[in-house]
Amino acid sequence: MDQDIEPMKFSVLIAVYAKETPAHLAQSLESIFHQELPPDEVVLVEDGPLTAELDAVVSRFKEAHEELHIVRLPQNQGLGLALKEGLTHCHYDIVARMDSDDISKPQRFSREMTWLETHPETDVVGCWTDEFADESGKVISTRRLPENHEALLPFSRYRNPMNHPTVMFRKAAVERAGSYRHRELFEDYDLWVRMLQQGARFHNLQESLLMFRLSPQLYSRRGGRHYIRQEIAFQCWMHKVGHINGLRLVANITVRTLIRLLPEGMRKYGYLFFLRRQ
């Protein structure tokens, strides 16, 4: 970024709930406040009451960083509604997302802001993620996504086009599409589809700028009848609004349902092979 030009101010939006691990939240917040391009404000949504240990982490960072603003929801509402509320408290048009257990690399905000400043036609920019599963931080895989809008639009008809915790977006474009809403398990994908239908443009930087924590429950959560029901409902909605045609609907549901029904040990490989390829 040109040192002679003052970058646009921006917010970071993050949500946390009672089941988060306090040490993971602390690592996430540390990575936010130690960026090459630090945020002008961080909006942390407490999605329902937190544990005493999580409260202690939040209080420690609040004392150290006056730019940290806390939004407390009296009851857990789920990620979509928590982010919807949090976005209304973001004062700047550029907003970076962050999850409460991931780690942003120091150059992430700088790289994404540079892209948005030099490409005013882009509404959402993201990047790849390096995935890790334990405290050693050893990378076990990289989640790569297509780069430009022309590739991401068709890609979005069968795969989520963005790594949600990596994105930086223009708040006005998100609000034009109706902002976040409750769509269990698919809050971000749902928003991207609505934005695409509004004409928003997307881009992925072709580098990993975030460490994505793979929880031990990742693949167990992505199976079972409840997940299948949510998956089918989301795919049917994409068909209803015209984002996918009937053949794509059948193909998407068939592949995803088969993978969700696999035993947990096999589901990991089905997920990586079918649902993670570019």
Label each PLM-derived region with a short phrase.
Residues 19-34:
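Short, well-formed alpha-helical segments that are part of the catalytic scaffolds
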Residues 46-56, 75, 99:
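A conserved acidic beta->alpha catalytic loop
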Residues 73-90, 111:
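Glycine-rich, basic loop-to-helix element that forms the pyrophosphate-binding segment
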Residues 95:
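Short aromatic/hydrophobic "clamp" motif used to bind/position activated sugar donors
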Residues 107-139:
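Conserved donor NDP-sugar-binding/catalytic core segment of glycosyltransferases
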Residues 128, 202-209:
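Catalytic beta-strand/loop signature of glycosyltransferases that borders the donor
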Residues 185-191:
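Acidic donor-binding loop at a coil-to-helix junction in glycosyltransferase catalytic cores
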Residues 200, 212, 220-244:
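Catalytic core of nucleotide-sugar-dependent glycosyltransferases
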